[in-house]
Amino acid sequence: MFKRGSNRATSSSQGQQPENPPSLKYQSSSSRYSFHRQYNTGFGTSPFRISPKYKPDSRTPFSFDGTGNVGPESSLNEEESNARWRPSESSFDKRRTFHGAKYSLSIGKEVSSIDKINSPESRSLIIAGKSHLGIYTFDEDSKTITNVHDFLQTAKTNTGITKNTSSTLRRTTKKISTISDVKAGFYNHKNYVAICGTSTSVAIYDINKTSAIDNPVVTSLSEHTRSINSVDFNMVQTSLLISGGQDGCIKIWDLRSPKISTTRSDVSINTGSDSIRDVKWMPSYEFSNDTNGLSNRHFKFASVHDSGLLLKFDLRQPNQAEKKINAHSGPALCLNWHPHQDYIISGGRDGKCCLWYVGDKSNQVGNISSTNLNSSNPATHNLSSSYPLGLSNTLAFPELTINTARSMNKLKFRPKYETNVFNSLIGTSSMGEDSDVSVYSLARKYIPKNVIASSAPSVGFVWWDDDTIFNIDKQNTVTGWDISHEPTVLDNLPKNTIKWRDLDGDGILFLDQKPGGYLSQEETVLTPGSGENRKMPFTHRMSSATANSFTGGNNPNITSNTSSSAASFSKNPTLGMSQLHQGNVLGERSTMSKHAQSVNSKFSPSVNSSPWTNPYSSPHHNSIVSGSESALHAVNDSFLQSPYLIGLDFPHILNTIRNTRLAEFNRKVESAALLELKSSPTEVFKFLARELKFSYKYNSIETKDNGRELDSSSTHGSVDSKTNLMEKLGLSENNTWTHLIKYTKSHDSDEVISKGTELKTPVSDKSANIEKSATNHKAETNQDENSSCINSSNQVKTKNLIELITLCDKNAEIYIMLEDFSNYKIWLLMRDSLLWDLKVLTESMAVDVTADQEVNDQSSIDQPWKKNDSFTSLKEARQASVASGYSSYSATDLSSSVNTNNRHSFNEPTHLTQTPPVSHLKAQLQGSKETTTISRADSIQNSLQNDIIEIRKLRQSHGDRAELAIDEEEEGEEREELTKRAFEEDENNKQFINIPRRESGPSALMPSPSHVSSQSEIPSNPENHHQPRRPRTSFIDSFMSQLRSPGSSNVDADRESTGSKKSSMPSFSSSAATFLNSKKSQNANHNKLKSATEVSDILESEFATQKSWNGSVAKTTTQMSGITALMNETKKLENTITPPWSSRRLIHQLYEQSVASGNILLTMAILLLFQDMFQLVDTETVKNSIAEFTELLHRYELFEIAAELMKNCPYEDISSSSAGFSSIQLFCDKCNKPLVNESSKEKIIKERLEGNSSAMSRFGYWYCDSCSKRNTLCCFCNKPMKSLAISMLNCGHEGHFECLKKWFFDENMDVCPLGCPAILF
């Protein structure tokens, strides 16, 4: 012993070493290289050294500290000494207060099994591996573990005599088979160790024979025919050894016989062909407080098998299994008996640990004297018989099930006396690369008590005492842990949480739980089946499924508590939401069980008396409510204690509340199917995913002469029920700004274009006689081709808009059917914005065609005035309302046609002496086709273009005055006079330009806008044409103009008569126009107009250059006119203003809102429909969204919707990922091996290279190279299926497609060709 504070030394095979400072050592192991440091772990004040070797892993409780040093780690072996380091108290307190790691040693050889030597004073372990069988001792004072002897490692001298191992002798290692299990004997045979493995023999070693001259092998038992998986010594009759292996036989050997037969067992039990994974004697620990005594436990043993069976036997009747239980759905891998009660816990590949009661129901076993198996009468004990499979009841249910989600490798009860079996602890280890040793309390099956993390997956462990566990891992390290010093998992878990359930759940879950512990409340629990009603303990630390295990479901005397807390629970106002799901516990939805044998229905007798049905058939839901609802009846009101788990189905609750409040309002009878659909959020999602339109095919849009009309239901909502509902809810479309658009005659683009060809300005018949020059004709021919291409593009855009409008209206109808008004209005907003775009696009197309027909064909100018087209009137009214600055229609826009004189009266110009040449108006107007939205500046441009056309018409209509030639001097004088008058008029008018006319009286220029309406209008030709009265600006437009431009409200009323598309001087009543007018009144000297001819020339030159309105006229000799400058400034303001109904702006905002609110369907619909048009997000985001949405559709089994989405997906990398080829591995029907057929493929390829071109026809996957057999033949023709084949699901028989087609269709058969009794069709 060492004193505190004194120097410590370490003894080793090489001597003693002084204490070393903290440092890192380079240590080699069989699997990796790592750095390790050893130091005191700090339990109390006792100095000791330790600890296990850990890699810096997130699973281990050790990690690198802030200084870069490794946590408490060491690497010890038999040949290497270990330096010790004891940290100071202060440094230790900063690092860790306690942990449970006590011992650690790196063995350096492969190990696979461990057991303790059943001699308390020896403190030894036996560890076995493929080439290692060693005895290890540990010291609790020094906290060290040492290898004492390796029975498989010896040294030979020259004389051939084997001596103890020495460093001077050459070492040899004896190898045995892979060890499956190692066990040590008890009492008189405590020096015996049995090992078994992949060989067919069990080797018995005497651990006391450690000298070289002694042979430690006592005997070798080899009656098994296949590898042995498990061996075990009997604790009472210590000479009895039991073994079980892959041959399905259980062998019992008696080691007391003086001449042991190594090839014949004393008892042999044949369980058939079912392999045995584990076999154990029932333990007989001598606990001081055990009142039952040893009784007859030593006669009992049990085994688990590959089929999942658990069998219990009695040695006195080995030909009959006392218990036969279907314990697991897959192979059962391990079992262990409770230390003193009739319980067995089993583990399997299905990841479940199941607790089974295997005691006698009467609890009174006959006192039969012990049967002594000795050599005096060996034949009487050689019982070889097969147990009858039908005699034992296999229908049993576990007392408790712990789900670990990993295949169980080892599990063992803690060897401690527990009055209540549910206070017992079990240690488990699993298969896999991420497996630790987990310690569970049966009172808390969902949360382990301790998780012992090691540097590598565990391969075996053993309980030394109540608190100490020794573990070996795949890094060949043995580690000892004291679980009493280990923190529990519960210490690091939150005690309350709130989570969203998945889409198939209840929406939201509240969980509040007190910390609790790992012990059950009840101190005593009677043995199941004792005939007495057991107490039914229920602790807040346990789930309802765990509570079920206390109630003894197999006891028919258990009565159900009819006044259960479940009824009061449903009436509790705070928990009343559970009533939303009648038949479910706490509102949790029912689930289906996959395996009938895994059900937790040991309360089945009490279920019948329950008014609720049991939706659960399996306890294997890692949830507090995973048990049967009958548990609510079997317990008292303590069920309402912690943990509280409340599930709320928010959509269902809100829909119920809303439907209740709107019941009187709706007053309509809905179908049961619709009501059921609305009550389930999942079904609503599926319904919307199926019904909503997410895309449209661009290929379907073709240019046709007759066009395609928009569905009337998508434009004016002809359904009366929908209209009435909208009006009741205040959602009527009569107040929308597209209301007037919807009731036009047609939205077809072709019709609109034809109507847009109508001219609105009266001209004389002489316009048809205009002669065109050859140069202008050639230029206009090229312009006609460009115009045709642009018109074709506009037609495609128009039909795309019509398609999108139809889809928006369709989606809106889907939402209105579900009474989802918010999403309904969203789709209406998008539809209306697209209708506005459609109107603007068709207007621009109409203007283009108007200009073409004006220039090319003047003969049809009289026809439009014979019609009164509403759409043309709307177009005309819209351009007239540009003066208001408010983009909406008013009721006065639809004015009737009356007989009236021409709106404009122009003085006859005397200086127009010749017919002007045809201008490049068509080319100048091409810029208007590039935009899809007509702003106020665009309307100004169109109006000025029409003014130029009117000036030309006036020149033609006054062609008789052109004969009066005026020489250049007279023209110069007149221009100077006109310039002077224009300047004076510009000062007075500040905005308007009046074209003078030569008259007998004084030259009359229009003095002000107010005089325009009162001035007498003179017709432009002798004939008075009847034309529609120009639309007047409505009161609403005037009112909005005043709101938007308060400074100009006093002149708007006077300018009302001039705000029209046909006006040669359009009015500007906005605040910007007012500001510019006042600015230009100060600089009027720079805004002179010389004559009407120059007005036309200047405007034409501006349009021809196609420059922005911010630029100036290219002519250096001509100053900028007042209108041009005003239009330039107005265009600047218009470029910075986006109307609120802009489809790009509106849809982008709606998309952002849907993303923020988590509306998946709306987000994807907007993204898929409008991404190409408006570029809402980047391409990568679109691809990710489509991929995630497709995965979501697959989760809801909406495969047809996902397939349609992928079919129309424009991104090949997304569509090809789901529609590409998939690799499917085929297996042979006979040998179950993969069908690779590489050998035959090489042979056939070689034949083809040699010249046999038809050799490849023999290759295929209809045969197997491994077993040289053909696969399943056709059930009709009995030939190999080399081509397309189909399978019948009822019976599983397969056949050629053509053969079965002939059988079922041609011969009209309805059964399988092989005569299966089931009718297929």
From Swiss-Prot:
Which residue intervals correspond to the WD repeats?
109-148, 174-215, 223-263, 271-323, 327-366, 403-450, 453-491, 797-837, 1108-1151
Which species is this UniProt entry from?
Kluyveromyces lactis (strain ATCC 8585 / CBS 2359 / DSM 70799 / NBRC 1267 / NRRL Y-1140 / WM37) (Yeast)
User: What InterPro entries is this protein classified in?
Assistant: WD40/YVTN_repeat-like_dom_sf, WD40_repeat_CS, WD40_repeat_dom_sf, WD40_rpt, WDR24, WDR59_RTC1-like_RING_Znf, Znf_RING
User: Which residue stretches does the UniProt record annotate as biased composition, category Acidic residues?
Assistant: 965-976
Zinc fingers (RING-type): give the ranges: 1274-1316
**Name of the protein in question:** Restriction of telomere capping protein 1
- Keywords recorded for this protein, A-Z: Metal-binding, Repeat, Vacuole, WD repeat, Zinc, Zinc-finger
Select a single GO molecular function from the record's annotations and give it: zinc ion binding
